[in-house]
Amino acid sequence: LVGSEMCIRDRSNLGTVELTMAIHRVFESPKDKIVWDVGHQAYTHKILTGRLKEFKTLRQENGISGFCRPDESVHDAFISGHSSTSVSAALGIATAMKLSGDKTHHAIAVVGDGASTGGELYEGLNNAGKSDTNIIVILNYNEMSISKNVGGMAKYLSSMRTKESYQRTKGRVERMLDKTPVIGKPVKNAVRNSKNAVKNMILHSTMFEDLGFHYIGPIDGHNLEELEQGLMAAKAVNKPVFVHVNTIKGKGYAPAEANPGEFHGVGSFEIKTGNPDVVLSDSFSSIMGKELCEMGEKNKRLCAVTAAMKYGTGLQYFAKRFPERFFDVGIAEEHAVTFCAGLASMNYVPVFAVYSSFLQRSYDQLIHDMAIGGCHAVICVDRAGIVGDDGETHQGIFDVSFLTSVPNMKIYSPSNYDELRLCLHKAVEDDSGICAVRYPRGRDQSLYDTSDPVSTYVYRHIEGAKVLLVTYGRLANDLFTAIEILRNRDIKCDIIKLVNIFPIDNEVVDIMSAYDAVLFFEEAYYCGSISEKYASICPNVAQFAIDGFVKHGKCDVLLDELGFSAEKMADTVEGFLKDE
């Protein structure tokens, strides 16, 4: 396994080796544009397109991305990261080809079946099927995304796995008619044009044909010859084509085949057994999930909702204990929020656990379906802040900016496990509207006891300090360390760690106003940040936040580059005071 020493998504890529090879043998990249949905399946594609030597740097600092990046290779036709976007992008590319007079080449969208739970996929299919473009949609069906696929579409696609007899029988009938003298071709064409003579004997038309696609499949995704034949047939059709490919996720590597979900985003592992090199202890996600279980025992109206991230968000514990109150809605964040609003309208308390970067998709629903109606719901914003290896598309740096624009929103940002438990209870018990609890990826690495079960913030004052440092969340630990570094440099600073970060706390404003200078360090996007809001009230506040997209790399390295390590924050404070 190339990359077993790195953190990669082996299952998706082992299942698509033959498919990727067939695509590159049949089509001419980059003239033909290959658009990978999400990009988890694209590692073989990266290797085949000249990045084998660099593959050992995958998802590492200054290495190649774990997703498709047009600025990395001309063979990466479109950026990837979030699910269900490929058909829309490929249709745009195919339309541009048509407008440019290119009637020869194709735009190929490669979609995993996990994306079949996402609404944007169907918006794209609905538009693409009736278009007069050279678009080919390849569905890689393996019955497994990150968690088990859910919903009616998963059942529909599963049922189609068993209906390969349709394509075989149709082919035999057409070959027989070809050999029939005189009337063979006319009869064959009549059968094709009406669709009913053959199909109704064996299989009703697929939904993809009803949308306007020429349907090919199901094809054995591990039979290279069959794949190439199917793709050559798709290439020859002068209309939108849907190719249905069946694969086994983790094909050829027994530990990956046997353990669904466990090889998604897996860390480095022992190649013979598949066992991880490091056994992770509790994380913010698992603590949230376990605490929610305890709360669910007492509150029978508490429900947990995920968008296909049961394991990643720690909700597997709640799902096991309260299956009737656990809901996995698939990769459908927009639907998830409105679904939660419906639960809330009937006096249930929904807790939607979602990664920060995926919550971006739900902005309209947060306002229109939840906030306007005054719904009491809890949003557990996992992976808030820098997440590291997944890069620009997954860094959780925008949630503060858009959540603070929603009226009556409350936002908590705990810095340790105790605060997380406390904030979760507060959010569930506060029935005045939407409460968001945001926390970082990984473990609690606090070195200081900075929790206060009563106050909405923690304030540490030393005599003679005229400078105040402010932060919240994960940065609190390093900022307390920076205070010690500065003390050794004979620089006295006070500190406030916010826990309830929004709405703005008037007590905190009063405290800030008493200092000569306030330096606010924030692991969030600059525009719309909490520091920006305090700076608009207190002219003595200097902001140090993130101003742009953040590439992939290790969290500690990225935080240091952004100026958020203890040493860098201490240097910033010292430099700021010298310039004053």
Question: Where in the sequence are the language-model features?
Answer:
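Short, small-residue-biased leader/transition segments that mark boundaries at the very start
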Residues: 1-8
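Peripheral docking tails and interdomain loops at the edges
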Residues: 268-271, 276-280, 388-390, 409-410, ...
